[in-house]
UniProtKB/Swiss-Prot annotation:
This is Glucose-repressible gene protein. The gene is grg-1. InterPro entries: Glc-repressible_Grg1. Residues 49-71 have a biased composition (Basic and acidic residues). It comes from Neurospora crassa (strain ATCC 24698 / 74-OR23-1A / CBS 708.71 / DSM 1257 / FGSC 987). Induction: Grg-1 message levels were found to increase within minutes following the onset of glucose deprivation and rise 50 fold during the first 90 minutes of derepression.
């Protein structure tokens, strides 16, 4: 039963990590866009950093769940 739970959690964390990656990339594009205002660019840069932290967190959790599902 734990193997099934770990597998489901692995999939969920991989999806959340991928979502954070997509958001990070979109925010990086906004931060680099010279047509945007300085405030918008700074907010996007901060959001990209937050997304990177979230991405790393979910990837680490997914790896832990993967290990739990295979052992």
């Amino acid at each position: 039963m734990d193997t099934l739970k770990n597998a489901a959690n692995y999939v969920g964390d991989k999806v959340q990590g991928a979502t954070a990656t997509a958001s990070k990339e979109a925010n990086k594009d906004v931060a680099k866009d010279s047509n945007q205002g300085v405030g918008t660019r700074l907010n996007a840069a901060g959001d990209a950093i937050s997304d990177k932290v979230s991405e790393n967190k979910h990837d680490a959790k997914a790896e832990a769940h993967k290990q739990g599902a295979t052992h």
